[in-house]
């Protein structure tokens, strides 16, 4: 039996997972880390704590499993989150600015007003938004004096979380095309940093990592990982797409976690969205041409359930929400738009704020809980409808993964609203599996068509609602969305 493993560094926790050659989880360990909120627009992580949790996860697994048996390791990570550290000391200059952070809206407004850079920005496939790394780097340069000073000595590296982990493991500065494609500084056609964007905002190209294919050799760690080669690096959502075996054009998946992230494989074609979606790199295998995707992102999915629990105390645990929501046959006319820090795709409205509408004396916590769950399905509908418009074709089946797929009420409602079949695989850790599988494919030099690991369906849901009812629900959702827009 052969084994391959994954470092899965997410928004709220780090994990190390070992898989066997059949895709079964052999061992794993997970550790949550601290979320910092310096003000209402800011979300930060401690890069040192992130690394410490990764180390601890690997050590805990090593107590139970001989990691020398592992043939290869993949890294998958929260994307866009940006870290700046010293090349000479390895110490961070500042906390990691997380993808959810919106403090840089003024910088984004400044960028959008500058016509001289619009053509270059369009080549990134991304809209100008606080979500991506560019505005975070500009903010760090302007607001952290030690960074500005150290840049004059070529002693700064700006990187996404994958680059930070690769550095801590190997001492090198590397990233892959999927993570680079989330920075707003990467030309998705040439697969290089866009030097015009860098020069415009005084970001030295020497302060950025070397860009490599997703499936390639990133080196190894002498001590922690016993010289096991790191042969794949992917952003978390691309790893999920890969783990779902969406290797052919037109395959689509949606991940339900802290946020929601839907991706469709567009093959070697770069599809620039006209409907508010992102164009991104899905993966690149060695020197082959990259595979592209279009993506829709929702900021608040599972995070909305956490808000019910932590801020409103309507539920005590996240798992309770399904039973509470099932206490009522429907939402009682209540709709919730979780635009806590604006709306992502396809609306892209940073001035939107959360609204709870349709309340009456009849409304109760069960209706509100149901509305929070249903908001996840409605937001996903908006993403997937936009995808079909961009591609000029519809899809029949949606592959789903993430923690929220355990919620049967949500998945059935999603099938009803989409009017499509939904399936989930029997591998729950699909993101980590995707990165580990990619590493295994590279080390074995397999063709994607030769991957014969059988992913069985664990659950499926089919639509079971009248078209008239569906249209009524969607009409009310669209009215609620309009209420949330242009709030500030």
Each model region followed by its residue ranges:
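N-terminal glycine/serine-rich phosphate-binding loop of ATP-dependent small-molecule kinases
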Residues: 1-94, 122, 213, 226-232, ...
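Active-site core segments that coordinate phosphate-bearing ligands/cofactors
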Residues: 5-6, 105, 112-126, 132-175, ...
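Extracytoplasmic/secreted proteins and extracellular or luminal domains
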Residues: 63-66, 204, 391
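Local beta-strand N-terminus motif with an aromatic residue
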Residues: 69-70, 208, 395
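Carbohydrate-associated surface elements
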Residues: 101
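A structural motif corresponding to the C-terminal end of an alpha-helix
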Residues: 200-207
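Core alpha/beta catalytic barrel or barrel-like domain that forms the active/cofactor pocket
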Residues: 210-216
């Amino acid at each position: 039996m052969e084994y391959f493993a994954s470092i899965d560094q997410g928004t709220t926790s780090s994990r190390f997972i070992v898989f066997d050659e059949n895709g079964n989880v052999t061992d794993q360990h997970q550790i949550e880390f601290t979320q910092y909120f310096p003000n209402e627009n800011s979300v930060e992580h401690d890069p040192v704590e992130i690394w410490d949790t990764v180390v601890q996860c690997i050590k805990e697994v090593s107590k139970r499993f001989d990691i020398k048996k592992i043939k290869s390791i993949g890294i998958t990570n929260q994307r866009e989150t940006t870290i700046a550290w010293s090349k000479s000391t390895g110490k961070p200059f500042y906390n990691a600015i997380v993808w959810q952070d919106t403090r840089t809206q003024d910088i984004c407004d400044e960028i959008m007003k500058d016509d001289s850079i619009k053509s270059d920005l369009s080549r990134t496939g991304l809209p100008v938004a606080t979500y991506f790394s560019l505005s975070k780097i500009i903010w760090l340069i302007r607001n952290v004096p030690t960074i500005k000073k150290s840049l004059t000595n070529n002693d700064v590296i700006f990187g996404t979380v994958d680059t930070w982990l690769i550095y801590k493991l190997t001492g090198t500065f590397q990233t892959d095309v999927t993570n680079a494609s989330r920075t707003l500084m990467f030309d998705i056609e040439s697969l290089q940093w866009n030097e015009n964007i860098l020069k415009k905002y005084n970001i030295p190209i020497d302060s950025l990592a070397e860009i490599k294919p997703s499936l390639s050799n990133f080196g190894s760690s002498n001590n922690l990982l016993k010289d096991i080669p790191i042969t794949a690096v992917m952003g978390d959502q691309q790893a999920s797409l890969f783990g779902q075996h969406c290797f052919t054009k037109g395959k689509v998946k949606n991940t339900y976690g802290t946020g929601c992230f839907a991706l469709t494989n567009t093959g070697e074609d770069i599809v620039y969205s006209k409907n508010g979606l992102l164009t991104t790199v899905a993966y690149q295998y060695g020197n082959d041409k990259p595979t592209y995707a279009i993506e829709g992102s929702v900021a608040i999915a599972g995070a909305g359930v956490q808000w019910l629990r932590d801020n409103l105390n309507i539920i005590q645990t996240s798992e309770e929400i399904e039973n509470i929501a099932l206490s009522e046959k429907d939402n009682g006319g209540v709709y919730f738009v979780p635009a806590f820090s604006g709306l992502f795709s396809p609306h892209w409205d940073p001035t939107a704020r959360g609204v709870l509408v349709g309340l009456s004396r009849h409304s109760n916590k069960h209706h509100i809980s149901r509305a929070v769950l249903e908001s996840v399905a409605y937001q996903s509908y908006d993403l997937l409808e936009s995808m079909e418009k961009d591609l000029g074709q519809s899809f029949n089946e949606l592959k789903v993964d993430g923690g929220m797929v355990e919620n049967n009420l949500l998945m059935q409602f999603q099938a009803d609203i989409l009017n499509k079949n939904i399936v989930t695989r029997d591998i729950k850790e699909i993101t980590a599996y995707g990165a580990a599988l990619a590493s295994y494919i590279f080390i074995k030099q397999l063709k994607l068509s030769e991957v014969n690991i059988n992913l069985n369906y664990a659950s499926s849901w089919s639509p079971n609602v009248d078209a008239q009812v569906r249209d009524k629900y969607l009409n009310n959702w669209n009215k609620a969305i309009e209420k949330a827009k242009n709030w500030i």
